[in-house]
Design a protein with these regions (language model features):
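N-terminal secretory signal peptides
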Residues: 1-11
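N-terminal export leaders
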Residues: 11-38
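C-terminal segment of N-terminal export signals and the immediately downstream linker at the start
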Residues: 31-86, 92-93
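Glycine-rich, aromatic-bearing surface loops/beta-hairpins
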Residues: 35, 223-271
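Acidic/histidine-rich, surface-exposed loop or edge segments in extracytoplasmic proteins
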Residues: 90-107
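Histidine-anchored nucleotide/phosphate-binding helix
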Residues: 112-128
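Acidic helix-start/capping segments at beta-turn-to-alpha-helix junctions
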Residues: 130-152
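A glycine-rich helix N-cap at a beta->alpha junction
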Residues: 157-183
Length: 271
């Protein structure tokens, strides 16, 4: 698939690749989907999720309440217990009865991954009239760097990237997000290419899944480069990175191994 990159942000994939059921019970919310048009858009105001997306709104609210354990002292290479990852949030996603449902295999930070997710959401919601459409990012590879907070970037990642990237700009909120969502066809508005942001997509109902395997392998590479100011063990550093995933991220025990679980739950694979 070829569409314009988010920004490219000066980040070379070649260089970075060298870096080492809770069922929601929402039958009551299953009202018939209504086509989205100008009249409904006018009622959106500052809301990024369409008014008739009742199932998506219910899921988003449930996910916000689902626990995210972020107090680890040490984590193993392979997770074997549900309390080591965000099991409740994942099962909410598996049980989601809205749709269509799409899971994106996102691996490259310098690819147009956010742009593609945004375009998919726009077409499904506005063109195909599916307000309860959900897009999941199964994030790994260099794209996973976008799922760490400022603490991790300041402490490790700016140095790890050789100063090529100094902060996590993928979570910045662009000025376009301030435009009223009711003006959905505004080429400089909320749904435009100027608003490719993880935070904005989350507000629209997209979910970004993190990968424990990527956490483990990234921290292994960081240790090999000698970036370890606190002299942490590998399990302790992996725990620190896990504790500093961005708000709203859903930790999987391994995202490549979790994609089949999404597919079993009816999600369509996209790359």
């Amino acid at each position: 698939m070829t569409e314009q990159n988010d920004d490219q942000r000066g980040f070379s994939r070649r260089s970075t690749l060298a870096m080492p059921a809770a069922g929601l019970g929402i039958a009551a919310l299953g009202a018939a989907l209504s086509p989205i048009g100008v009249a409904e858009a006018a009622t959106m105001g500052d809301e990024f999720i369409p008014p008739h997306a009742t199932k998506l709104k219910a899921l988003t609210a449930a996910l916000a309440k689902a626990p995210r354990r972020r107090d680890f002292k040490s984590v193993p290479m392979i997770l074997t217990s549900a309390d080591q990852y965000d099991s409740e949030a994942l099962h909410l996603l598996f049980a989601y009865s809205g749709g269509p449902k799409q899971v994106w295999d996102n691996t490259a930070l310098d690819s147009p991954w956010l742009n593609l997710m945004r375009n998919s959401m726009n077409a499904q919601i506005w063109s195909w009239k599916h307000p309860d459409f959900i897009a999941i990012s199964a994030t790994h590879g260099t794209a996973h760097l976008a799922l760490y907070d400022k603490y991790i970037w300041d402490k490790y990642l700016t140095k790890f990237t050789g100063g090529k990237v100094k902060s996590n700009t993928w979570v910045d909120v662009p000025a376009a997000s301030k435009v009223s969502a009711s003006d959905y066809n505004n080429p400089k508005g909320v749904f435009s290419p100027l608003d490719n942001s993880i935070v904005v997509l989350q507000k629209r109902g997209a979910v970004f899944c993190a990968c424990h395997n990527e956490v483990w392998e990234l921290t292994m590479g960081i240790l090999k480069k000698g970036i370890n100011p606190d002299k942490l063990s590998h399990p302790a550093m992996a725990a620190e990175f896990t504790n500093h995933l961005i708000p709203g991220a859903v930790l999987t025990p391994g995202v490549v191994g979790t994609i089949p679980q999404f597919q079993l739950a009816g999600y369509q694979y996209a790359k």
